[in-house]
Amino acid sequence: MHYPFLPHGTRRFSMGFVLVSLMLGIMLPLAACGGGPAANTDTASSGPANLTYWGWIPGTDKMVALFNKTHPGIHVTWVQTPGGQPTYDKMFTAIKANNEPDLGQIEYQLLPNFESTGALVDLAQYGAGDLKSQFVPWTWNQVVLGNAIYAIPGDTGPLGMYYRSDLFKKYNIAVPTTWAQYADAAVKLHAADPNSYISDFAPKSGGWFTGLAWQNGSHFFGIDGQSWKVNVSNPQSQQVATFWQGLLDKKLVKTETDFTTGFYHDLGTGAIATWIGAPWTASSISTNVPSGKGLWSAAPIPQWEAGQTKDGNWGGSTEVVFKSSKHPKEAAEFAKWLYTNDDAIGIYITEAGAYPAKTAALDSKVLNSPNPYYNNQNLNDVFKPASTQVDATFQWGPTMNQFYLDLGDNFSNATNGKGTLTDALSATQTSTTTFMKKQGYSVSN
């Protein structure tokens, strides 16, 4: 099953690939690719079904080795890819050549891009539907389309607030539970120490802002009959943008690129006192800011109204099977096993710092132990409830590569004094609508 409103002639041609290719100045044919033979030519009589899996998560080699040991009829070879966009570029190129691997790791936001190529196997025919009850409910909505199941959820990124508990205690600042309190804390902190800012608004971090908007009930994309709806500048996302614009105008937040040396330096010195992040953010801080041991804690994400328990998501990936596989049944078996087997998930958590989508895994011992870096706090006390509070109706668009690029450029303009963050949302809505229409998508607004 495919989106009924896909651009003509693109069943095997991703819009994400179109974008990347245009950026490189390469002209590519828009006709659908043919269904030639796949590279994998194993047959049942030649021994185990040999599968190739592309992904980037550390520890996957150990998970694959465990699967191969316990499934003698199937042999999986893991090809480690760079992660993120470089992996997707490689996959889109392989799709065009009808030479995909059997399996691939894909983040949630890219699933519509890949599904639009027609290259993904509907896993419902291989019993994937039987797994639905095992996963955090909102993740299942991310991988299904009608009766079709195009991926198996792997991990998630519900949001919480990491904060310098030493600074909050030093300056007698209460841990904020609402965004209004967060803004007040920003004022108090900066007044107490002009070199300390409540947080960092990283303009190029589109996934981070999307998670914040998601928490507030924002829906950038939707489906209206046979067409897409684009509503980036909706009231909920405008409220989030206006809030952060207020902090920017008062010079209470920084605007540096996250995940950089300078960013981690500021986390270490206290120049940045909070970071709205996901479970995986914990290891990013502890690994890159070793001097911060005992200085950081975690709390639930602030709410827009007191007493609410709403959350958004930042990060997480899935497992898909590509149609060029000569062994889709065996590939589906591996995909289902990878994110439901307790031993595999244990490796996933300890080796990659992943936060599993499987509900039962959230009760595992490794996730419910005191963390020495965070004052021996059990971080799962924050993130387990958060994982159930993510809005399950959130919908990704079919051109998320373009969307994030434009959003980042427009936010960068705003943080450099060229307009506001709400202006950036409006500009991104216009450019996204225009881009989708040029690619042949039906857009109703």
What spans do the regions from the language model cover?
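Hinge/lid segment of periplasmic solute-binding proteins
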Residues: 108-159, 212, 295-299, 373-374, ...
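Hydrophobic residues within well-ordered alpha-helices
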Residues: 91, 182, 189, 213, ...
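A structural signal for short loop-to-beta-strand junctions that line the ligand-binding cleft
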Residues: 93, 101-102, 130-167, 197, ...
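Alpha-to-beta junction loops
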Residues: 95-106, 119-121, 195-196, 269-278
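Glycine-centered hinge/linker elements that transmit conformational signals in sensory
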Residues: 186-190, 227-257, 301
